[in-house]
Regions:
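HhH-family (HhH-GPD) DNA N-glycosylase catalytic core used in base-excision repair
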Residues: 1-314
Length: 314
């Protein structure tokens, strides 16, 4: 296995340690391996598996990410693809100053901006993965969703070993498209979700659903294209647009967790309705997706603190 090391300097300020903290508690971080201040992830570049191994050094205003790429027959195109992927997933090249300025419009949200000032949205590795995880997360607790995601990976994913650790590659769209939905049901996934996963995987494997093409369209067009697929509703579409395609100004306002925390922070005495959440979120334009990320980070932090206090383990 060949190994190449490169370095990335994010737009400052940036706290990669805080980003790793998010991933440690995220129900969407299934294939990521976080150990101390080190990030490991196996991905595919074309048909070739590679391992992305990231550490960091320096203060938040001068952070450097040290990116090792491990794989067979590495070339310049592969390395460039991986570095672009890292910058995209961690939003490293986006100037956060306009987002931080939202505190002037909304002092309540400004509390979160201050708490998580030096981290930016972390995307799910690719839109297809975001679609799978979001479908499995429909109307279930995050712990249940996490177990289902792991079960799917172990059913039809691909393990590889790196530095003494077992990493897993996401199943390809073709892997899942060729499965009988009943096989997916046997690992504890509902019939409806199993059918949707196979359906979406078939559309992606045949090129009928092209996420690269969707990424270049206007948000409303993407939303309409996704919600035309059976089993994909508004919440799923907006989560995929935000977490998978990286639309900065899309917020999944139907998310119950967001509704609860916004209702609490804004003194409603109850969870916000979807309409109320969208109205409050008008103050966060054109960064509503970034705002949703911080609210989710706050929810994860609160849940983690509660879990530690009660002595629970994942």
């Amino acid at each position: 296995m060949e190994l190449v090391e490169e370095h990335i300097t994010p737009v400052s300020p940036y706290n990669f340690g805080l980003a790793l903290g998010y991933l440690r508690t995220s129900s969407s971080a299934i294939l990521e391996h976080i150990s101390g201040d080190r990030y490991l992830r196996a991905i595919r570049v074309g048909d070739h598996p590679v391992v992305v191994d990231i550490t960091f050094s320096g203060p938040i205003d001068q952070t450097t990410l040290h990116v090792k790429v491990a794989g067979e027959r590495l070339n310049d195109d592969t390395i460039r693809t991986v570095l672009t992927w890292v910058c995209r997933v961690f939003s490293l090249e986006v100037n956060p100053a306009p987002f931080h300025a939202l505190y002037k419009r909304d002092p309540v949200f400004g509390i979160l901006i201050n708490n998580y000032r030096n981290v930016r949205p972390i995307l799910i590795a690719d839109p297809y993965e975001a679609m799978l995880w979001t479908i499995l997360g429909q109307q279930v607790h995050t712990r249940v969703a996490r177990r289902m995601k792991w079960s799917l990976v172990r059913l039809c994913g691909h393990p590889l070993e790196y530095d003494g650790k077992e990493l897993w590659l996401l199943p390809t769209p073709r892997d899942i498209a060729n499965m009988d939905p009943s096989d997916i049901e046997r690992i504890g996934i509902s019939k409806q979700k199993a059918n949707t996963i196979v359906r979406v995987s078939y559309l992606v494997s045949t090129g009928t659903l092209d996420f690269k093409e969707l990424g270049g369209l206007e948000p409303e067009s993407v939303y309409q294209a996704l919600t035309r697929i059976k089993g994909i509703g508004p919440w799923t579409a907006e989560c995929v647009m935000m977490r998978g395609l990286g639309f900065d100004d899309v917020i999944p306002a139907g998310d119950v967790g967001l509704q609860h925390i916004v209702g609490r922070f804004y003194g409603l005495g109850r969870k916000a309705t979807e309409s109320e959440l969208r109205q409050i979120a008008e103050k966060w334009r054109p960064w509503r997706g970034w705002a949703a990320f911080l609210w989710w980070f706050q929810l994860q932090t609160e849940a983690y603190v509660q879990q530690i206090a009660s002595g629970e383990k994942e």
